[in-house]
């Protein structure tokens, strides 16, 4: 193999690795965003449950807007 062919093969490997990494990162970002949204919804449900109980709402007034 000549130097030019080796250089072309090297560039193809670099390009393939870069494209694969870029698409993998985007897929992971989407999965992380979905997990974060799910966690936020679960936390909101827990806070609403706490705010519905007077004892818990009294302890965590900053979460329940100061209401009992």
UniProtKB/Swiss-Prot annotation:
Region (Lacks the Ser-Xaa-Pro motif that is crucial for potent interaction with nAChR): 52-54
Main location: secreted
Keyword terms, alphabetized: Acetylcholine receptor inhibiting toxin, Amidation, Disulfide bond, Ion channel impairing toxin, Neurotoxin, Postsynaptic neurotoxin, Secreted, Signal, Toxin
One Pfam family in the UniProt entry: Toxin_8
Listed GO CC annotations: extracellular region; host cell postsynaptic membrane
Entry superkingdom: Eukaryota
Cystine pairings recorded for this chain: 50-56, 51-64
Compartment(s) of residence: Secreted
Residues that make up the propeptide removed upon maturation: 22-48
Tissue: Expressed by the venom duct.
Record GO terms (molecular function): acetylcholine receptor inhibitor activity; ion channel regulator activity; toxin activity
Domain notes: The cysteine framework is I (CC-C-C). Alpha4/7 pattern.
Family membership: Belongs to the conotoxin A superfamily.
Name the UniProt record assigns to this protein: Alpha-conotoxin-like Lt1.2
């Amino acid at each position: 193999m000549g130097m030019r062919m080796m250089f072309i093969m090297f560039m193809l490997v670099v390009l393939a690795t870069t494209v694969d990494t870029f698409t993998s990162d985007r897929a992971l970002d989407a999965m992380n965003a979905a997990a974060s949204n799910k966690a936020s919804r679960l936390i909101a449900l827990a806070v609403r449950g706490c705010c519905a109980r007077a004892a818990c709402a009294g302890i965590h007034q900053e979460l329940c807007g100061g209401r009992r």
